Amino acid sequence: MYSESLSNDNYDKFTSDLFNGFDSILTENGVVIYNISYGNENPTQMWTCIADVCKNTNFTIAEAIVWKKKSALPNNTSCNKLTRICEFVFVLCRKDEYMTFNCNKQVVSTRSSGQKMYENIFNLVVAPNNDGACEINKAAYSSELCEKLLALYAPNNALVYDPFMGTGTTAVACKRMGLRYIGSEISPKQCEYANNRLKGVKTQLSLF
């Protein structure tokens, strides 16, 4: 169980334990999409955490995607730190599936040799910060971000698992896209909020 009071080393271990759990349930050539950031109180935590996963689990980094948000508030009060309008989203796959993990890139042409040429998709995603203010979760991301990432990596009819479901943003994106989903959340308030939120979400025929 995650706790805000975890030390740096314990947080790294918690994350590695989480990924070892993922290894037992993730389908062949599936990926884990993991958003993580850092704060001034611990600027190295993000890097040590991901490094620990790569060292102590069966996973490695497949992609490092930059999520550019629409706004960065509150205004910066630091004399030397830049205003952070971007966060990282790491895509991790099993080490022995690095060359075969699923990505929904489309073939745009085929050379005479038979070599397939694929569309260019850049490792930058522009999406809103969140789906609006939420009093019970200040750290929610946007369903648009989820939809864009799932469009890249989720096969048709995929089953998506979010171990920190929160207010249900991942589930909202999945429901719109016609994907199946499972979520875990220890907060009863957020579970209730997510269930009520999902009642008003309809599956859309196409993403764009």
Regions found by a protein language model. Give the residues of each.
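Core catalytic lobe of class I
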Residues: 1-193
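S-adenosyl-L-methionine
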Residues: 195-208
